[in-house]
Amino acid sequence: NMYFAMLSKVAFEDGKIVEHWDNLQEKPTQPNPSNRTMIDGTTEVKDLAKTEENKALVKSFVTDILVNGKMEKIANYFDGDNYIQHNPQIADGLSGLGKALEYMASQGITMRFHKIHKVLGEGNFVLTVSEGTFADKPTSFYDLFRVENGKIAEHWDVMETIIPEADRKNTNGKF
């Protein structure tokens, strides 16, 4: 059996679903190095008054670090090494993220974010929908962040290879 993790976004008009987008990734059978999975973790939405502030923080992080590669700014977005990671391959903390990026580089695996398409949020949760490449393949990135005390505290993600236009069943596009 194969199991998948999926992040979805849905557009409503007059209380009815009018559009749906999702990202789908095979869910590993084992937890990540910190014993976390792609589907566990905090779920309580709070700090509703900080929604716009949290969206701005996460957009700035994705722009500075993931799109523009300004790694010298990364510590500004986290509370030291306190960072809960749900990516199947990455351990908790900035140290875990650093080790994963070093390993990918040593294997010649590149990950590049080219464009943020959407930043959606409510309270302490912010979702970014981005486009780029992973291992030289066009990829869509759905990254869900939990913000606490003005810092990124937790992260989930689902990456999906974007199929070529010639293989698509419609012209709606991924974004």
Where are these regions (language model features)?
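C-terminal and inter-domain tail/linker signature
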Residues: 1-175
